[in-house]
Amino acid sequence: MTQDYKATLHLPATEFPMRGDLPKREPAMLERWEREGFYAQLRANAAGRPLFVLHDGPPYANGQIHLGHAVNKILKDIIVKSKYLAGFDAPYIPGWDCHGLPIEIAIEKKYGKVGVKLDAAQFRQKCREYATEQIDLQRRDFKRLGVIGDWDNPYKTLDFRFEANEIRALAKVVDNGHLTRGVKPVHWCFDCGSALAEAEIEYADKVSPTVDIAYPARDPGAVAAAFGARLPAGVGVAVPIWTTTPWTLPASLAVSLGAELDYVLVEGPADRGQPRWLVIAEALAAKALARYGVDAVVVHGHAKGAALEQMLLNHPFYAEREIPLLLGDHVSAEDGTGAVHTAPGHGQEDYQVSRHYGLLERYGAAQINPVDGRGVYLPSTPPLGDTALAGLHIWKANDVIIDALRGTGVLLAASKMEHSYPHCWRHKTPIAFRATPQWFISMEQANLRADALKAIENVHWYPSWGQARIAGMVDGRPDWTISRQRTWGVPIALFVHRETGEPHPRSTELLRQVADRVEQGGVDVWYTLDASELLGSEAADYEKITDILDVWFDSGVTHEAVLPDRGLPKPADLYLEGSDQHRGWFQSSLLSGVAMDKAAPYKQCLTHGFTVDEHGRKMSKSLGNGIEPQDIMKTLGADILRLWIASADYSNEMSLSQEILKRNADAYRRLRNTARFLLGNLHGFDPLRHLVALDQMVLLDRWIVHRAHALQEKIVAAYARYDFAEIVQALLNFCSVDLGSLYLDVTKDRLYTMAEDARGRRSAQSAMYHVAEAFVRWIAPVLSFTAEELWSYLPGQHVDNVLFATWYDGLAPLPADAALTSADFDKLLVLREQVAKVLEPMRANGAIGAALEAEITVAADAQTAARWQPLAEELRFLFISGDVTVTAASTDDIFVSAQPTTKAKCVRCWHHQASVGSDPRHPELCSRCVSNIEGPGEQRRWF
């Protein structure tokens, strides 16, 4: 080459870095956002817009954040940011759940239980300090994820104002008639020393003993007569029960049957030499008798369970205790014997059926529930023959009771079985039902269950199956046990009558007065309060309740304790948490909301799945497959983590591994490189001076704006329905196919070789400007740091941050009367693929080195040929080939052929043209390049 024409080319130039270097750049951006008060600016910029309130479910203030936290917070952040771009004011107030047992345990490990080194007030203060420290640690990591919010003013359930508002919320619940007190069986953790709510229970496999125990009939002849049978002399009758909790037998007060179940009177094993007939459900008789070593089923009569109602049995080892036969809906013929031993102190159904029959009034509290809060039998528990039970822990009592019953004739069978059993979610230890005095929110007393089920129907659930799931849980759940016998929490600030146990008739008024004091001095005010200050002369007749509220009540009333205080409306637009929260926060919020306002506290409810490894296994330290968000941010950056979360199907389990992270890093590079190429080609472009109107653009440029418009409509709709995976996929496809494989490739010629200010070049830059303006907004909710960086490099005048803008309004579809319609472009792109297929073997066999060395002939039917012939001169730019000829042929198909060109190559544009050398001043250039350098420049209409 005799002359160097490089200086005449307009090659891409940008300072936007090729490498993201996110672990270094992101912290600097965070510092700037913090320094400039970014969240406050964002809210101020959005003032006056319609509100969209995503109410934050509070994480527990204990321990470092994990991957599940990151998923939750980033999903929320994507939604909040997309709402700002959609023209909303979307305040985000993060919160923390600060009371409860895990924090108590942490303080107990250091200082011992209350009363050892610290009194209750000092203990609560240490809990408060610990929770505050944990919040600071978690807040730092949440901010590092790129999550925007009012981090300087979060809501915390330990704040005096919140604690006061929680007591005010309780007053509304009381006022509406939902609070009740009673001795009921509740889930009890012996390690916690407290009742547990449904949401605090998880199920795990446990090996339990199974026993079949015979309850002898007091009047065997009467039982036989109910079956239409005559009992021979010397034959006994018994009703066997099957249970996995032998420890509950000392509390057994009845045996329940199914009213409509069919029972048979069958010959059973002898009782120490005496013949014995047994009452067993017909469907279970053969199986039960086989357990007892009886092969043949010899039936002496049939009867419905209802025929045996109120007949009396003997307790298997407390002979003086008469055991009535009751009827219960909970009895089935699925397993066991069809007869259920009934201990009202240790089971919900047992309690209900016993209450129905008035059984509870016949026995004292120690007989109904002989087990204390540590899981030990009370001193008053009678012995089993010569075997003492008092002081024995129930888990040890199982084997002791079984051994003591051997040889007595009542133990028909004993074995072991593994089954799913409720455990404490904190201690991972088995729990038990214990009847204790507790405070409940009744599901029936003021129609809470029916109202809640109705409210569920008015909520939009994502995914849709969430509606049936939570409805099933609410429909079948027991009353909500809201009292806890612990120290660190919000007190149930009620005064109850010393004799009747009834709450003071002015309870709601008194609760509000207590709340006013708590707002000034915290919950300690309740414990130091002299009752006479509020009750005057009545104080001697009343005592203060020292139980605290369930932590699920704490978080469940945040809609009442937080939103009105912050000037935000109820119900919130959206609650978003993990799928376990149908039985947790979603449900506690629903029940409290309906109890207070007869409405759900949210309009929409979205759930996400749990994180697992690439094999679908739960992440854990023991498996060594855990991936911490902090490590991802240190090595790859928060935007890579955010991209993975957005691209995953969060409605199911979300798989993560190093390989998956690598794939997301590759996808990120594709997006970043696209942005960099756009910026590089916008070098020297000023939209105020150079922007070409849409109707004046080269048609290929107009087409890419059309494609961007269609994509934006798709993206905006997907953000609105929270389908982030579709957005990521659509973006990557647009970058790879529409831009990477086509538009950016085709327009290089115009951008590089045309005169700097040529309309064809400015047209391409204008299209790229429109695409870049839209692109930065599309990625902003997901790739927050990268979008901010890209925003700072865009040409033209802009607001300070991309989130101060809204979805880009500079895009538009191709008009229906365009010289080339969208359908025309679709056909041309199919033709372009045909050309590529024809050229591929020519490249392979060495006939050509590049597509520019091939001349193309397109043969089509007359109508198609006539449509495309005006484009023929520019089709070579679309195909990035040598000259293109379009001919009419008598065929319905389109045929493409190619041959190597014999024309000289222009050293500047690399096209092979007959005009190369036609200008003696530039013997190595084609006439087009000469015109672009020195003349008026070429004109383009199509491509």
From Swiss-Prot:
PROSITE patterns with a match to the protein in the record: AA_TRNA_LIGASE_I
Positions annotated to bind ATP: 621
GO CC annotation terms, alphabetical: cytosol
EC number: 6.1.1.5
Record-level Gene Ontology MF annotations: aminoacyl-tRNA deacylase activity; ATP binding; isoleucine-tRNA ligase activity; tRNA binding; zinc ion binding
Free-text remark on how the cofactor is bound: Binds 1 zinc ion per subunit.
Cofactor(s), names only, from the UniProt record: Zn(2+)
Protein's UniProt keywords contain Kinase: no
Compartment annotation: Cytoplasm
Metal-binding found in the keyword field: yes
Enzyme type, top EC level: ligase
Record remark on domains: IleRS has two distinct active sites: one for aminoacylation and one for editing. The misactivated valine is translocated from the active site to the editing site, which sterically excludes the correctly activated isoleucine. The single editing site contains two valyl binding pockets, one specific for each substrate (Val-AMP or Val-tRNA(Ile)).
Protein name, as recorded: Isoleucine--tRNA ligase
Origin species: Xanthomonas euvesicatoria pv. vesicatoria (strain 85-10)
Gene that specifies this protein: ileS
